[in-house]
Amino acid sequence: MRSLWKGSISFGLVNIPVALYPATRSEELKFRLLRSSDLSPVNYKRVAQADGREVPWEQIVKGYEYEKGKFVVLKEDDFKRVDVEATQTVDIMDFVQLDEVNPMYFHKPYYLVPDKGGAPAYTLLHDVLTETKKAGIAKVVIRTRQHLAAVKAQGQALVLEIMHFAQELVDVGELDIPVAKGGAKRRELDMAKALVEQMTETWQPERYTDDYTSALMAMIKEKIESGGKTSGAAPKPRRATNVIDLAAVLQESLNQTGAGAKKKPAKTAKRGKSRKAA
């Protein structure tokens, strides 16, 4: 795997040479738009809204719409004037307790791998973050854009987690979330806790697969093999129902989970003492 860039982690006077690698991969299927008559791929053209004419690249400029229909044009020199220092450095500004950071701030992880001569300092930072349960909050430039990021210890590696800036998150106060008067009823709360307990498992991420993509890929293969035909009708979507009697629904859920996949094995019956022959 090729690194995205090579640079360094910087905090205080310490500089650790590292290489940045992606920690995720995209499994999304890609589709092309086609003309239905002959399946010819459809291309896009740059067309002006005013007259519908195609616009060549040399006549295109970037503009910011500050009012409806009003634009200010920005040239390449304008972007360069406000460009942040595009050094390939993970510049740690602060260290914070990891459990203080709302997980909603985390966006996308990358691996940081020590480069030549960086192993001792890399290991030191990794162990410090592990023992203190802290993360380094940094700024880093990736592909010409500056990001907020957290440097975290993950297993044997250091992970650079790209974060959202505070203004990018929607405040929950902007949402109209209804709350039941008096809170949840005690009986329903106890039953819900029992249901959660019955459904609790040890975290095993490999158990959770992308069933939609798998089914879609299987259908694509079927269409290829059958010349474009598919068998069977599409499943009917489930209709959402308004829950009126929560207690009854919870009890039914408890009955199903208790007798279903989580059913405990029956205990072996104890043998009684054998009687002596008369």
UniProtKB/Swiss-Prot annotation:
Bias kind Basic residues: ranges: 261-278
Annotated ranges, domain Ku: 9-172
Biological process annotations from GO: DNA recombination; double-strand break repair via nonhomologous end joining
A Pfam family reported for this protein in Swiss-Prot or TrEMBL: Ku
Family: Belongs to the prokaryotic Ku family.
UniProt subunit comment: Homodimer. Interacts with LigD.
Name listed for the protein in its UniProt record: Non-homologous end joining protein Ku
Organism: Opitutus terrae (strain DSM 11246 / JCM 15787 / PB90-1)
Organism lineage: Bacteria, Pseudomonadati, Verrucomicrobiota, Opitutia, Opitutales
The gene coding this protein: ku
